[in-house]
Amino acid sequence: MNDAGMGRFEGSYLGDRGRLAADARLECKICWWEYDPEVGDPVWQIAPGTSFSALPAHWRCPNCDGEAEQFMVLGPQA
């Protein structure tokens, strides 16, 4: 069996924040809340301009409390 697709899904960064671009937007796969670094996260007092990879290790989705590892990378903005 080919394992090329096992453990991966389109948009996954596999919890490796080092693979993310500074301007990467990510979406919670539980509630679809979007983290946009241009906006930051006012709930967690994350300043605009903060990349997803620079979020604190304890950061969670402000909408559903999902773990950061549950986020998927979104494609480029149109």
From Swiss-Prot:
Molecular-function GO terms, alphabetical: electron transfer activity; iron ion binding
Cofactor note: Binds 1 Fe(3+) ion per subunit.
CDD domains (UniProt xref): rubredoxin
Residues annotated as binding Fe cation: C28, C31, C61, C64
Taxonomy, superkingdom: Bacteria
Requisite cofactors: Fe(3+)
The Rubredoxin-like domain, residue ranges: 23-74
UniProt cross-references to SUPFAM superfamilies, sorted A to Z: Rubredoxin-like
Keyword list, A-Z: Electron transport, Iron, Metal-binding, Plasmid, Transport
Transmembrane domains' residue ranges: none
PROSITE patterns: RUBREDOXIN, RUBREDOXIN_LIKE
One GO biological process term: alkane catabolic process
Entry similarity comment: Belongs to the rubredoxin family.
Function in brief: Rubredoxin is a small nonheme, iron protein lacking acid-labile sulfide. Its single Fe, chelated to 4 Cys, functions as an electron acceptor and may also stabilize the conformation of the molecule. Could be involved in hydrogenase-linked redox processes.
Protein name in the entry: Rubredoxin
